[in-house]
């Protein structure tokens, strides 16, 4: 039920030991009911809300599956993780999200094994942009915030791809803000070593992320207008 798969990247990690498990994909059930095909992908960060079915599905998805609908993997992932940790001498565990439900796996591992735990937040959790534009019950918001607070507080380190304002928000949620660090997204330089340098007449700016009405990109266009 993931929208994009780049299977060619598997060759980059062939030397890394990988363990696969079963996962109960809640979104596969949505796809089956919606299109008759449970393998049909759902666009990232997209929650349709055009029909009665979509509205009900959105309400269920955001209020019953906390923190997200990928939580169907947690039972199987934790079961596998216990075997790996018991069999090997593991010192550190890193959980990355979204999906932020993966951090709940890390929480269970921390509770049982007391390993050093690093939480990697590729995107905000309770501040995730599409949560602001959808209706959620108060108990759903409180539970989501509670889970986030517990994960952040129990972790030994927190990594984000941005700093400044988001770090201020995170700092208010933990007793030790010094454990919050930023590591910017990077790229493999060798992929561009053989790309010839060009100086075209037109300059292209490409954004490959997600834009929504909750993002403030007006300043970008204002600056672009000034310098153009």
Q: What kind of feature is each model-predicted range?
A:
Residues 16-17, 92, 108-129:
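Active-site proximal beta-strand in glycosyltransferases
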Residues 48-51, 65, 77, 81-102, ...:
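Short N-terminal targeting/anchoring amphipathic segment
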Residues 79, 101-104, 108-112, 125-126, ...:
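Membrane-proximal helix-turn-helix segments that form the acceptor-binding/catalytic region
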Residues 164-165, 183-186:
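Carbohydrate-associated surface elements
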Residues 2-75:
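A conserved catalytic-core segment of Leloir-type glycosyltransferases
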Residues 113-116, 156, 176-179:
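A short helix->loop->beta-strand "cap" motif at the edges of active sites that frequently abuts
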Residues 188-194, 198-228:
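Conserved catalytic-core segment of nucleotide-activated headgroup transferases in glycan assembly
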